[in-house]
């Protein structure tokens, strides 16, 4: 079944039909979802969702755009939340120089601290990196050794993807791979072994064709699987089966 390794069902875009939608997912071919926090406040929300639905798990972390609100007391509270058996990762954490909401040194400080948190609680990490390739790689090489995890919504070169794979990380691929202009990501998807790829939505964002621009949901991963299958001369069913196993290995589910 489909394993959505990165979703945001706590987002307000789902306020009108969240319960109905999440309950329907197994009937739509979706076996497992990891709901990923982006703000400190959403850490509690993703855990509540994970507690309510057997097929939903949680990741605890603060997105680089939101790290200005962090302090050590909040990190300690996040550490306590990570003890819950439904928490499978620390994330999403990283660097975002595209939006540049926080100074680079502030982003880097809290990225490193959350990598340390992952080491303390022995969880893999979900990495967000946008227009920050070199700094992300430098920090990962120095602070993420042995953690394991996924480079979410991968957007860099094939060579850098291969480097992350050598470091023990999976490459997260979502709806962008279905876009006509996504040549670089298609090259990455074709080159990286299927055993090192996991599928994701980033819903409600990043919907694949034919739903581009609409609200995304986990069942739409079928379109991502079909595109990767085409690039790799596999069947979509094989892609879904292998990436589900990869995700279970990644998150220890």
Which stretches of residues belong to each language-model region?
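Mid-domain alpha/beta scaffold segments of enzyme catalytic cores
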Residues: 1-253
């Amino acid at each position: 079944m489909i394993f959505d390794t990165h979703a945001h069902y706590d987002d307000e875009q789902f306020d009108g039909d969240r319960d109905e939608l999440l309950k329907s997912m197994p009937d739509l071919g979706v076996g497992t979802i990891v709901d990923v926090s982006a703000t400190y406040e959403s850490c509690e929300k993703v855990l509540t969702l994970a507690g309510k639905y057997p097929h939903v798990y949680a990741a605890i972390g603060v997105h680089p755009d939101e790290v200005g609100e962090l302090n050590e007391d909040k990190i300690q509270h996040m550490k306590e939340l990570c003890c819950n058996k439904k928490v499978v990762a620390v994330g999403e954490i990283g660097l975002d120089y595209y939006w540049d909401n926080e100074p680079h040194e502030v982003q880097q400080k809290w990225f490193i601290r959350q990598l340390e948190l992952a080491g303390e609680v022995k969880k893999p990490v979900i990495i967000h990196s946008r227009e920050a390739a070199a700094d992300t790689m430098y920090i990962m090489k120095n602070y993420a050794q042995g953690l394991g995890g996924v480079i979410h919504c991968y957007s860099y070169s094939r060579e850098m993807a291969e480097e992350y794979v050598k470091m023990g990380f999976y490459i997260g691929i979502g709806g962008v791979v279905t876009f006509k202009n996504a040549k670089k990501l298609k090259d990455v998807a074709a080159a990286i072994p299927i055993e090192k790829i996991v599928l994701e939505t980033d819903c409600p964002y990043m919907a694949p064709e034919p739903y581009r621009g609409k609200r995304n949901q986990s069942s739409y991963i079928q379109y991502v699987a079909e595109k990767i299958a085409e690039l790799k001369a596999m069947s979509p069913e094989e892609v879904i089966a292998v990436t589900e196993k990869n995700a279970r290995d990644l998150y220890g589910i």
